[in-house]
Amino acid sequence: MSHEYDTVAPPNAKRMKTDNQLEDKKILYVVLEGCSLETAKVGGEYAILSSDKHANFLRKQKKDPADYRPDILHQCLLNLLDSPLNRAGKLRVFFRTSKNVLVDVSPQCRIPRTFDRFCGLMVQLLHKLSIRAAETTQKLMSVVKNPVSNHLPVGSRKMLMSFNVPELTMANKLVAPETDEPLVLIIGGIARGKIVVDYNDSETKISNYPLSAALTCAKVTSGLEEIWGII
């Protein structure tokens, strides 16, 4: 099952631009904010700092290991890019690190299944500023200029996902089925705390219980798939 799932071809980028951006505006933009993704030279090699592997190193640097959770970004990207919504060509993903590095993720990017391989890829991304497909020159991930609002559709509705707000919106009610416009959802790629941004129009929650970033990603993509009839 997993082998078959992993071999499903991702959407074609050129077709997506023609079919979706020009004809169908029903696209979900997800921005993962505050993601922990920081490199340092540990044991003679550059590595993505992680609370599990580098707790002693971080304490020596007088940093809290609990703030270094790149696994959250890994889980979120797996949920987003593996989703039927992405395979249908109706998802765009950006993430911004706690160091204010903004990254554009291609819908065709295949996220490594293992965390170690993911970290290796992220070291390459932060040092070379892009990741290219092995067989082509296509960029699968690239560092782009801030602000993120320059990369989002003009006039789009931008909602910040937050548990600490009274408004509750079911994931399958985030947009009306007949609404022909893109939606931007901002999700904190953090383990604790609150994300504060200056480009959202509103704040909402999709559950009466606190959700992890990865579960939030899974629920919103599932909700939009239901709204837009993607099976």
From Swiss-Prot:
GO terms for cellular component: nucleolus; nucleus; small-subunit processome. Its EC number is 2.1.1.-. One of its GO terms (biological process) is rRNA base methylation. S-adenosyl-L-methionine binds at residues 161, 188, 193, 206-211. Its main location: nucleus. InterPro entries: Alpha/beta_knot_MTases, Rbsml_bgen_MeTrfase_EMG1/NEP1, tRNA_m1G_MTases_N. Disulfide bonds: none annotated. The record marks 69, 110, 113, 117 as: Interaction with substrate rRNA. The record marks 71 as: Stabilizes Arg-69. It catalyses: a pseudouridine in rRNA + S-adenosyl-L-methionine = an N(1)-methylpseudouridine in rRNA + S-adenosyl-L-homocysteine + H(+). It is found in: Nucleus, Nucleolus. It comes from the Eukaryota. Keywords: Methyltransferase, Nucleus, Ribosome biogenesis, RNA-binding, rRNA processing, rRNA-binding, S-adenosyl-L-methionine, Transferase. GO terms for molecular function: rRNA (pseudouridine) methyltransferase activity; rRNA binding. S-adenosyl-L-methionine-dependent pseudouridine N(1)-methyltransferase that methylates a pseudouridine in 18S rRNA. Involved the biosynthesis of the hypermodified N1-methyl-N3-(3-amino-3-carboxypropyl) pseudouridine (m1acp3-Psi) conserved in eukaryotic 18S rRNA. Also has an essential role in 40S ribosomal subunit biogenesis independent on its methyltransferase activity, facilitating the incorporation of ribosomal protein S19 during the formation of pre-ribosomes. PANTHER family: NEP1/MRA1, RIBOSOMAL RNA SMALL SUBUNIT METHYLTRANSFERASE NEP1. Belongs to the class IV-like SAM-binding methyltransferase superfamily. RNA methyltransferase NEP1 family. Homodimer. This is Ribosomal RNA small subunit methyltransferase nep-1. It comes from Caenorhabditis elegans. The gene is emg-1.
